[in-house]
Amino acid sequence: MKIKDWNRSLKVRLVGEFFMNTSFWMVFPFLAIYFAEEFGKGLAGMLLIISQIFSVAANLFGGYFADRFGRKRMLVSAAVAQGFAFLLFALANSPWLTSPELSFVAFTLAGMCGSLYWPASQAMIADVIPEKYRSDVFAVFYTTLNIAVVIGPLFGAVLFFSYRFELLLTVAIISVLLGLLLRFYTEETLSAEVLEKWKEGNATGWRGALLTQVKDYGIILKDRVFLLFVIAGILGAQTFMQLDLVIPVYLKETIDRQTILDFLGREWSVTGETSFGILLAENGLIVALLTVVITRWMTKFPEKWVFFFSALLFGLSMAIFPMTSWFWIFFVAMAVFTFAELMVVGLQQSFISKLAPESMRGQYFAAASLRYTIGRMIAPISIPMTAWFGFGWTFIILGSFAVLSGFVYLWMFHLYDKRTVANI
């Protein structure tokens, strides 16, 4: 399905979200450094964990609100609110005021607004795109996000430290403009029947709404197929989240200075730090260039085996890293790692939309994100594991988690196929 054939709302979002994501990634990668300098590493770490907890809660509420009030209303409200949060962030770093405490509050609010935005954005795609094309569309949005992730920090490395107030003010303006763009140039995609169903519900007041939400998420987690999907995702996250955890630490300790190319009498050498930068660029370049191509290729195969072999390749990439200290082997391992990532990036989002009833799509997407949020909380344990077991065993254990996730996916599809046959 070509972009020109998309619903107008998705075209508007694709452009607007690219600029929003690019500006966001000019700020986000440098916040850990900023808060560590202002509060100290220990307190900064605790504050970032607290911020993450608020974002998880907001994400779950975002799913409920997207199903209850509609996709468009949530997207507009979250984008504008995020703009005001960044405006507060800018004020806390302005010529008139310098307040790290207010900066943390503003950052937390901005993160919560982003978490409110995400479930509605995913559900909107599932609302308007036929099932057979959803993987392609999710892949295109993923590609633009990763281009933003590559471009944003390049500018942010200069702007965040030298022109922080101006940068944060710009991000605030872009967020509000995105909200206005969504307000006037997108349409509501949640069906009128579903909205009417919510209006006829029995929940009254905020207590009733909260009880209804808890009940709905309870129903979702009783879905054994979906629960296995989340469990497999948490296991797999222990591998792919090592890109900015154990992998850079290993490279730094393994490569002192190594010649990677000798051409016409000139040598090119890398250190552990520069080698990680090259591998990160490799990952970003492959994602930017090949996400849509690989996603379309993978749709030709059964989802069960795509999920399974993606998990095996993640495990293989982890096994390759400790085998050597040669940079080019690391380069190959990163290619395997990235290919495994791209095999499932569109298919998994499409699979969630197939599991979710139309009236609960937002909540399903929100609950599915638990595989990342819980995985992100557990993944840093890999760092002390290197002290307990050494790098070799740490990589083997991480790779084993990935392989185990593959077998969980097989069990999940066994139950899914049984359910599908029973519903025929």
Swiss-Prot record:
Query: According to the UniProt entry, how is activity regulated?
Result: Norfloxacin transport is inhibited by CCCP.
Where does the chain cross the membrane?
A: 15-35, 42-62, 74-94, 105-125, 141-161, 165-185, 227-247, 274-294, 305-325, 327-347, 367-389, 393-415
A single GO BP term for this record reads:
potassium ion transport
* Gene Ontology, cellular component aspect: plasma membrane
Which Gene Ontology terms cover its molecular function? antiporter activity
Q: Short name of one Pfam family for this protein?
A: MFS_1
Membrane topology of the entry: Multi-pass membrane protein
Per its UniProt record, what InterPro entries does this chain match? MFS, MFS_dom, MFS_trans_sf, MFS_Transporters, Sugar_transporter_CS
Name its cellular compartments. Cell membrane
What are the alphabetically sorted keywords of the record?
A: Antibiotic resistance, Antiport, Cell membrane, Ion transport, Membrane, Potassium, Potassium transport, Sodium, Sodium transport, Transmembrane, Transmembrane helix, Transport
Q: What is its main location?
A: membrane
- Activity dependence on pH, as recorded: Optimum pH is 9.0 for Na(+)/H(+) and Li(+)/H(+) antiport activities. Optimum pH is 8.5 for K(+)/H(+) antiport activity.
> What family classification does the UniProt entry report for this protein?
Belongs to the major facilitator superfamily.
Q: Which PANTHER family match?
A: INTEGRAL MEMBRANE TRANSPORT PROTEIN, RESISTANCE PROTEIN MDTM, PUTATIVE-RELATED-RELATED
Q: What does this gene product do?
A: Exhibits dual functions as a Na(+)(Li(+)/K(+))/H(+) antiporter and a multidrug efflux pump. Catalyzes the efflux of Na(+), Li(+) and K(+) in exchange for external protons. Shows a preference for Na(+), followed by K(+) and Li(+). Can also function as a multidrug efflux pump. Transports ethidium bromide and norfloxacin.
- Protein name in the entry: Na(+), Li(+), K(+)/H(+) antiporter
